[in-house]
């Protein structure tokens, strides 16, 4: 098992396809509580950065399903999975929640990076999640946080949320300046 924290620059990138940044991936995956042999779904895989990190954490005995509706993002996820030589990833081109029908197993954790149709996705995700499993949602909007918490609470999940504000060092001619990134909310819930 490998701990998450691959530098962002190691991923193949395309400008219009968003990527969950390194520090956020580390925190989100820690909230997912992955382990060697775990089964995991990444909904809205984008560049595949969360998919790759999860694939490395769960190891050869584990399995990761990456769901993505954008054709270009699917191709980018494939390229990053190939770059990191992962054999435990299944990439599903399709839109959640319908694409969840292609996941043939109960899973230990689910990450939701795209927030369209969030309530429907959460309700469908619940059917794929083992008891004691976790759903983790990244969000930039307060409305998304409210909808995620409200839905998870109605489903009987034990929930919490953190706000993450990261500043990265930028080298200048006189030293380092700290440049803030946008705040991110990480909502997580544990299935009873």
Swiss-Prot record:
Keywords, in A-Z order: Cobalamin biosynthesis, Methyltransferase, S-adenosyl-L-methionine, Transferase
SUPFAM superfamilies: S-adenosyl-L-methionine-dependent methyltransferases
GO biological process: anaerobic cobalamin biosynthetic process; methylation
EC class (word): transferase
UniProt pathway: Cofactor biosynthesis; adenosylcobalamin biosynthesis; cob(II)yrinate a,c-diamide from sirohydrochlorin (anaerobic route): step 8/10
NCBIfam families cross-referenced by the UniProt entry: CbiT, PRK00377.1
The protein's name: Probable cobalt-precorrin-6B C(15)-methyltransferase (decarboxylating)
Organism, as annotated: Sulfurisphaera tokodaii (strain DSM 16993 / JCM 10545 / NBRC 100140 / 7)
């Amino acid at each position: 098992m490998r701990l998450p924290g691959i530098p962002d620059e190691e991923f193949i990138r395309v400008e219009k396809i968003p990527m969950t940044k390194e520090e956020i991936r580390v925190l989100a995956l820690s909230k997912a509580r992955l382990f060697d042999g775990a089964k995991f779904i990444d909904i809205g895989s984008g560049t595949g950065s969360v998919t790759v990190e999860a694939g490395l954490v769960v190891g050869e005995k584990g399995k990761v399903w990456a769901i993505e509706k954008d054709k270009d993002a699917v191709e980018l996820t494939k390229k990053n999975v190939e770059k990191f030589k992962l054999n435990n990833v299944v990439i599903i081109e399709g839109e959640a929640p319908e694409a969840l029908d292609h996941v043939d197993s109960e899973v230990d954790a689910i990450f939701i990076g795209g927030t369209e149709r969030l309530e429907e996705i959460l309700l469908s995700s619940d059917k794929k999640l083992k008891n004691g499993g976790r759903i983790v949602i990244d969000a930039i909007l307060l409305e998304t946080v409210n909808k995620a918490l409200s839905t998870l609470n109605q489903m009987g999940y034990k929930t919490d949320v953190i706000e993450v504000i990261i500043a990265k060092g930028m080298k200048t001619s006189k030293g380092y300046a700290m440049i803030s990134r946008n705040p991110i909310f990480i909502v997580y819930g544990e299935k009873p």
